[in-house]
C-alpha cells in the first residue's frame, strides 16, 4: 500500500503541482485550497466542483490529512489540552485557552525539543522529530473549538525557528487569501533566538515575535538555557534592534520568575538596560514546578515589584495569568514522553 500525501499543509504553489499531476488546470489549485482551508473538508470526495474522475485520481495518491485528537484533558479553569499522533509512537500536545474576550491555541512545532532548558518538561523529553506543515496545521484545523479561535501562539512543544521551513509554510497558509486569511496580528511565534531562523522571520514575516529571555545576565541565562552559548541574548537583541517594531508587529520578551534567582530589582534594572531602545513588552511568567527540578517560583509581591519597576522605567511589563497547571498544560509543562508506549 502506497502512503498517501496530505493536502492539508500544502501551499497554493504545491497544490498547483498536485493539479498538474492529475491533469487538472492550474485554477483547480485554488478550488482545492478553498475546500481544504475555508470549508475544512475531511475527504477529497467532498470537492464537488472537481470532476468525479479527477477526484478519483486524487484519491489514489492523496488524502486531506485532517485527523482528530487522540485524547484531551480539561482544566478546572476551562483550558483544554489535546494530544495528537505525529507518526508511529510519536505524539504532540496543543493547548486551547479560552478567556472572556478571546480564544488562543498554543501550537507545537516539534516532537520534543533540542534546547534542553532547565525549567521545561519538553526539553527534558529530548528531541525526536520536526513536525510537518500538515501536523502543525492539523492541530489548528482539527481543533473541536476551531471556529472560536481568535489567536494562535507557537509556544507549545519545540523551537519553532528550528523548524523554520515548515513553520513558514504554515504561516503562509494561515495568512494568505487562499488559506485562512488571518491577520498576522493574531499570530505570535516564540523563540529562544535561533539566529538564522530569527533573521528570516524578521525579514519575511509580519507576525508577532516572543523571545524567551529569563535573565539579563549571560552566565545566569546559560545555567537556565544552554542555548545561551550558541545564541547569546545580547546578540539576539542586537539583531532585533535592526528591525521596526513601532507599528503593528510586536515583540515581547518572556521572563519566567524564579525565587531568589532572577527576581531582584537588580535584575529588573539590568533588564531595562538590555531592552533599551526596543518598543516591547515583558511578560512575567510564574514558574510551574516540574519533576526533578529544584527551582521555585517567585512570590507575587516580588513579581509585582519587578513589574512596577520596569513600567516606571518605560518598559511595558505585565504578569501573565497561569492557565491549565492542574493538567500539566501551563508554560513549560508540555511533554508526551509518557505517551510513547501507546503506539
Curated annotation (Swiss-Prot):
Instruction: List cystine links.
Output: 106-331
Binding positions ([4Fe-4S] cluster)? 113, 117, 120
Protein name (database record): Probable dual-specificity RNA methyltransferase RlmN
Per the entry, which co-factors are needed? [4Fe-4S] cluster
Q: Spell out the reaction equation it catalyses.
A: adenosine(2503) in 23S rRNA + 2 reduced [2Fe-2S]-[ferredoxin] + 2 S-adenosyl-L-methionine = 2-methyladenosine(2503) in 23S rRNA + 5'-deoxyadenosine + L-methionine + 2 oxidized [2Fe-2S]-[ferredoxin] + S-adenosyl-L-homocysteine; adenosine(37) in tRNA + 2 reduced [2Fe-2S]-[ferredoxin] + 2 S-adenosyl-L-methionine = 2-methyladenosine(37) in tRNA + 5'-deoxyadenosine + L-methionine + 2 oxidized [2Fe-2S]-[ferredoxin] + S-adenosyl-L-homocysteine
Q: Where is the active site?
A: 93, 331
Q: Which family does it belong to?
A: Belongs to the radical SAM superfamily. RlmN family.
Q: Which organism is it from?
A: Parabacteroides distasonis (strain ATCC 8503 / DSM 20701 / CIP 104284 / JCM 5825 / NCTC 11152)
Primary enzyme class: transferase
Amino acid at each position: 500500500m502506497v502512503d498517501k500525501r496530505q493536502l492539508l499543509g500544502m501551499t497554493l504553489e504545491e497544490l498547483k503541482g498536485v493539479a498538474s499531476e492529475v491533469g487538472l488546470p492550474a485554477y483547480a489549485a485554488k478550488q482545492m485550497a478553498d475546500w481544504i482551508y475555508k470549508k475544512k473538508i475531511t475527504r477529497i470526495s467532498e470537492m464537488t466542483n472537481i470532476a468525479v474522475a479527477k477526484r478519483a485520481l486524487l484519491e489514489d495518491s492523496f488524502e486531506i490529512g485532517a485527523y482528530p485528537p487522540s485524547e484531551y484533558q480539561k482544566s478546572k479553569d476551562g483550558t483544554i489540552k489535546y494530544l495528537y499522533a505525529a507518526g508511529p509512537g510519536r505524539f504532540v500536545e496543543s493547548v486551547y485557552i479560552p478567556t472572556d474576550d478571546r480564544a488562543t491555541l498554543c501550537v507545537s512545532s516539534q516532537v520534543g525539543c533540542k534546547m534542553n532548558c532547565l525549567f521545561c518538561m519538553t526539553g527534558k523529553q529530548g528531541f525526536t522529530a520536526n513536525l510537518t506543515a500538515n501536523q502543525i496545521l492539523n492541530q489548528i484545523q482539527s481543533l473541536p473549538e476551531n471556529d472560536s479561535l481568535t489567536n494562535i501562539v507557537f509556544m507549545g512543544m519545540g523551537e519553532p525557528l528550528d523548524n523554520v521551513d515548515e513553520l513558514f509554510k504554515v504561516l503562509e497558509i494561515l495568512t494568505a487569501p487562499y488559506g485562512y486569511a488571518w491577520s498576522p496580528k493574531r499570530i505570535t511565534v516564540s523563540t529562544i533566538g535561533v539566529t538564522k531562523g530569527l533573521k528570516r522571520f524578521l525579514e519575511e514575516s509580519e507576525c508577532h515575535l516572543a523571545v524567551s529571555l529569563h535573565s539579563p545576565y549571560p552566565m545566569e541565562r546559560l545555567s537556565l538555557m544552554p542555548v545561551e552559548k550558541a545564541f547569546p541574548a545580547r546578540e539576539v537583541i542586537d539583531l532585533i534592534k535592526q528591525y521596526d517594531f513601532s507599528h503593528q508587529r510586536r515583540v515581547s520578551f518572556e521572563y519566567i520568575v524564579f525565587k531568589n534567582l532572577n527576581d531582584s530589582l537588580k535584575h529588573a534594572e539590568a533588564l531595562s538596560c538590555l531592552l533599551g531602545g526596543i518598543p516591547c513588552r515583558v511578560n512575567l511568567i510564574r514558574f510551574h514546578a516540574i519533576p526533578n527540578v529544584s527551582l521555585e517560583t517567585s512570590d507575587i509581591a516580588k513579581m509585582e515589584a519587578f513589574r512596577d519597576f520596569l513600567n516606571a522605567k518605560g518598559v511595558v511589563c505585565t504578569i501573565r495569568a497561569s492557565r491549565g497547571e492542574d493538567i500539566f498544560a501551563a508554560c513549560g509543562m508540555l511533554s508526551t514522553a509518557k505517551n510513547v508506549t501507546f503506539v
